[in-house]
Every structure is written in C-alpha cells, then in structure tokens.
A protein has these predicted regions:
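Phosphate-binding loop of NTP-binding sites
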Residues: 8, 84-171
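N-terminal leader/targeting and accessory segments in enzymes
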Residues: 1-87, 91
Length: 171
C-alpha cells in the first residue's frame, strides 16, 4: 500500500524541517485517536495545546508529529501548525483529480454527505470526511486524509460565524 504522505512531501508542502525520514498512512489532530503510522499535527486550541500530547501520540505509534515548538522524537518543525494543516489539505486536493462535492446548509449536512458517499462509492473510489468534521480544523484535516487516487471527494462544510463557508470553500 502506498503511503498517504512521506516526510519529504510534508516538508515540501509545509516548508518544514523533519528530524527523520518517515511515511504516514493517516493524519490526526487528536492523540486519543492515533493509529499506528498516523501523522500527528499538534494544534493550539482554546483549551489544550497539542504539543502537550506529542509524546503520547508518538508512543501510540504516530509516524511523526508536526510541531512549532521543539519536541523530542520524530517531528517536523514548522512555523505554524494550523497553517501546516491547511497546506496539507490544499496539497491533497491539488494532487488528486477528484471531483469535489461540498455539502452545506442548516440541517442534514452529515446525512446528505453520507448518502452521496454511499451512492458514489458504488461507482468509483470515494472519500468523505468522517462525522461532522466541517470547521476550520475539520475541513483541512479531512482533505489531508484524502488518498491521491480518489475519484469523488465529499466534504461537509459548516459555519459558526459569517464568512466561514467562503473561507472553507477555498480549500
């Protein structure tokens, strides 16, 4: 199976510096959900700093951690981890020829996205964001998880403030 990301690709996309060579089969921003081979992106949140969980993510099998603070272990140092995640999402979209479908609205986004995914997955390689990952963190995270050979990408976009859909649609 071809890796989702290599250290060289992520270095290029994020303009970061990797401490070692690695391959990643997934991307995560939550150390509690790390799967072996994931790339962990240490985001700064309103209540937690992902950098506090880098050691935990690596001990659970993360291939590397994207950080903007120096940490021990397999890391890729960038200027801003949120911008790095956005860059990964944009790069994932550029490297595929997938038809991208965005689902927005007040009610029924997740169900509609899942129904479209179900129908299209019968025809070709289809990727959709998991659950309701539809905000400024979830959309670039979901895009960064999209395999290069995807034919259809279905993404839910939500908003908490005016103009948010516009910025998410630019991803």
């Amino acid at each position: 199976m071809k890796p989702l990301w290599t250290s060289a690709q992520v270095e290029y996309v994020t303009q970061g510096q990797s401490s070692s060579d690695w391959i990643a089969n997934g991307v995560s921003i939550d150390s509690r959900t790390i799967e072996h081979g994931d790339l962990f992106v240490a985001l700064h949140g309103p209540n937690y700093d992902g950098h506090d969980f880098v050691s935990d993510a690596l001990s659970k099998g993360a291939a590397a951690a994207v950080v903007d603070k120096t940490r021990e272990g397999s890391t890729l140092k960038v200027g801003d981890t949120m911008k790095a995640l956005q860059s990964l999402g944009l790069a994932a979209r550029k490297r595929t020829e997938a038809t991208i479908i965005a689902v927005t609205g007040s009610v029924g986004k997740t169900g509609s996205k899942d129904a479209i995914c179900f129908a299209l997955s019968r025809q070709a390689c289809t990727f959709a964001n998991k659950g309701s990952l539809n905000n400024h963190w979830g959309v670039p995270l979901s895009l960064s998880r999209m395999p290069p050979k995807t034919t259809y990408g279905i993404f839910e976009l939500g908003m908490n403030h005016p103009g948010e859909i516009y910025s998410l649609s630019k991803m």
